[in-house]
């Protein structure tokens, strides 16, 4: 599971994969794994016909660099992928956590006082303090509810200058990705924590995102990714049923694991390849390939 692929290392986003890292990851996958379209892997899971060392590549949220940087590399190695898109952030939108990170990138040195939100005062100096501040705010805000998160993000942004409006895909680029063979999946409208919403609002998020993507692409997405994606903390059985009711054929989560015979197709586990060296990555992938019935979704 990926989110972004950056052209070079960004100190404000230390965990994101760079183009160089992504290239060797895709090279290793292409040489040693049977990399499948996720929709095909789901069909094969349903019929117990997955090949050995099967793997799938997925991206969450719908960042512009998925098309600009990741897709050409995947095309080079013949790697299929699925990009799960939160439809409300297309065409110049920005996720609340990105608003915080990009604001902390440019806020002047001094202190950021978030006492009125119960978050305290943060020193702002070198890049290290900015990264610590950004991710402390994100962690503390994630489960406060959508309105409160937006309020905090907007307040932080008010202390910064102009923020980028090109982080996410446009509708046109989304169509280009689809035309290039990349599958597009549903990821709600606004990327909320579903477990924190009234059930009808959760239904609207799931169905609305699917309808919006269908309007852009001419066909509805077949697979869904739960925002944040952790069982019980971010979604529960009610949301699984909503995903089924919306017409999705399967769904992925962020609980770490590999999928095999008997895995719930509406709760397919994934993992993120954080490894920064080829050797560690190969060891991790080899270990995952031996688990269960030797199938993995990244």
Q: Residue spans of the language-model regions?
A:
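Extended, charge-rich helix/loop segments that form flexible
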Residues: 91-183
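CE4/NodB-like, metal-dependent polysaccharide N-deacetylase domain
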Residues: 50-51, 63, 68-84, 138-162, ...
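Short secondary-structure transition/capping segments
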Residues: 78-91, 125-139, 232-238, 261-276, ...
